[in-house]
Amino acid sequence: MSATFVAHVRARPETVRLAPEGAPTIAVRVEMPEVWDVVRFAVSPAEPTINLKRRALEELAPDMGEHHEDFVFKLRGWEVLDENAPLAEVGVVDGSILLLTHRRKRPVRRGG
């Protein structure tokens, strides 16, 4: 599969750009299962991971009112431990899919 194909599957129509116009970028997707939503980003491989995480939270969960420390970024099923490292350094490449989810599992509330 190509990075272009992966970037467009079930995502919002717009791409959020985190790099200056004309700068080299990679396309990544950030998925958040709690809100069943996906956002595409055009971002520099040198961008600190924490910046992408914060911007993704603004896009995907602006009303959650929680701090970014309450969430974890996962790449290929593994938690990104050094969020200050550049995206390329933690293994993000063109077409990568990052999962943004609560750090701790939350209990399921049953109605009734």
Briefly describe each language-model feature range:
Residues 1-112:
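Ubiquitin system architectures
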